């Protein structure tokens, strides 16, 4: 039985968002070739939910002419930094991070990731001891984009110090004939899984799945 819901804690729930309550602007603009910080938080706690969307998808209803660019799922890089670290713990294309590795949008959901109504979500618990920063880099050579994002987090001064930090590793390859190493990691931690996307060099030809694949 999960009795945590009945336990008194010092947690406070807060939200980081691109919505500006003064201007009523919902998004931040990320021109091609630029990096923008979505937000930065100081304190001890954990992220419990990340939700993000782009023009022409979730909010196409109030902005019908908004262009739709699925390539932005590969060219927009998401980075998350923990505790003032110089290197990001998360660095991956937004599509791959949320489980859409081939830029083909489709609704799905599992325990930790999913896409619904044009928005992407991640519910992995992500602890931090001193704070976090989230930024995005637009590496697209043609497309500027807007981002609408909400990050739900809990500040908890009593957070267990013996917890791991959430990390990702992104790898990609083409024309592979040898075994492909998805990641090589050393240190204490848990491997929680991967999102694997494959596509044949001949589009819409699934014959490459006829060969034995080993993981």
Which residue ranges define each predicted feature?
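Beta-strand-centric surfaces of beta-sandwich/beta-rich domains
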Residues: 1-215
């Amino acid at each position: 039985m999960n009795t945590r819901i009945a336990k008194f804690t010092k947690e406070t729930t807060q939200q980081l968002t691109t919505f500006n309550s003064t201007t009523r602007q919902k998004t931040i603009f990320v021109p091609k070739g630029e990096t923008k910080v979505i937000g930065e938080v100081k304190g001890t706690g954990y992220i419990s939910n990340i939700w993000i969307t782009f023009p022409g998808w979730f909010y196409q209803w109030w902005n019908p002419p908004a262009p739709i660019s699925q390539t932005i799922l590969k060219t927009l890089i998401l980075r998350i930094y923990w505790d003032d670290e110089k290197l990001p713990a998360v660095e991956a294309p937004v599509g791959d991070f949320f489980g859409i590795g081939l830029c083909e949008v489709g609704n799905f959901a599992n325990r930790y990731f999913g896409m619904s109504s044009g928005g992407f979500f991640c519910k992995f618990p992500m602890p931090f001891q001193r704070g976090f920063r989230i930024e995005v880099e637009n590496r697209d050579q043609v497309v500027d984009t807007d981002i609408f994002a909400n990050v739900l987090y809990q500040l908890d001064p009593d957070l267990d110090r013996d917890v791991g930090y959430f990390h990702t590793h992104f790898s990609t390859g083409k024309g592979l004939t040898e075994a492909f190493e998805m990641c090589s990691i050393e240190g204490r931690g848990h491997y929680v899984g991967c999102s694997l996307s494959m596509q044949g060099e001949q589009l819409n030809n699934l014959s490459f799945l006829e060969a034995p694949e080993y993981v």
